[in-house]
C-alpha cells in the first residue's frame, strides 16, 4: 500500500468515527424532530386507548376475553392467560386454531417469548402459556383466531407498571 492509500483509509475511518460521535452526542440536544422513530418511540399512547379485557374481534366474528394468572400480569415473569372465545351471538367456540403475538408499539419490538395456546379447556376457554412482558409500558397482545372456516383478529392493550 502506498502512503496516499493509507492516508485515505485513515482519513475515512476518522471521518466516520467523528460522524458517529456527533450523531450520538447531538441527537439528544437537537431533539426528537431529528430522531428516527425507533429512537424516540414510534407512537404515543392514544388518549382513548381501549384497555378492556373483553371485546369483539376486528371483523365482529368473535367475542374474546382474557384473564391472567397471576392478576395483574407481572413483569419479567413467565405466566399464563386463559382466553374465552365466543361467536358474536354468544356461543362458545370449540376447536379454534389460535396464534398469539404482540409487542410494544412505542418501542417497535415484539414479545420476548413465543406464547402458545397449549390446551383447549372446553366451553370456549383456551390456555395460553409462555406470556411475558419484560418492561413497563404500553403492550399489545393479538390473537389470530380461525374457527369453522372463519378468521379474525383481536388486539388487547395493556399498560404495565
Locations of the language-model features?
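Intrinsically disordered, low-complexity terminal tails/loops enriched in metal-binding residues
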Residues: 1-161
Amino acid at each position: 500500500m502506498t502512503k496516499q492509500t493509507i492516508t485515505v483509509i485513515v482519513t475515512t475511518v476518522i471521518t466516520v468515527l467523528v460522524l458517529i460521535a456527533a450523531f450520538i452526542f447531538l441527537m439528544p440536544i437537537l431533539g426528537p424532530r431529528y430522531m428516527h422513530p425507533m429512537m424516540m418511540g414510534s407512537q404515543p399512547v392514544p388518549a382513548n386507548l381501549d384497555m378492556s379485557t373483553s371485546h369483539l374481534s376486528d371483523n365482529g366474528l368473535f367475542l374474546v376475553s382474557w384473564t391472567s394468572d397471576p392478576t395483574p400480569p407481572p413483569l419479567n415473569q413467565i405466566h399464563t392467560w386463559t382466553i374465552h372465545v365466543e361467536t358474536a351471538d354468544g356461543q362458545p367456540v370449540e376447536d379454534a386454531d389460535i396464534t398469539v403475538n404482540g409487542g410494544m408499539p412505542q418501542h417497535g419490538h415484539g414479545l420476548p417469548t413465543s406464547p402458545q395456546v397449549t390446551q383447549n379447556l372446553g366451553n370456549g376457554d383456551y390456555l395460553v402459556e409462555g406470556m411475558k412482558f419484560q418492561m413497563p409500558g404500553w403492550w399489545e397482545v393479538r390473537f389470530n383466531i380461525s374457527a369453522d372456516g372463519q378468521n379474525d383478529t383481536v388486539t388487547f392493550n395493556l399498560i404495565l407498571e
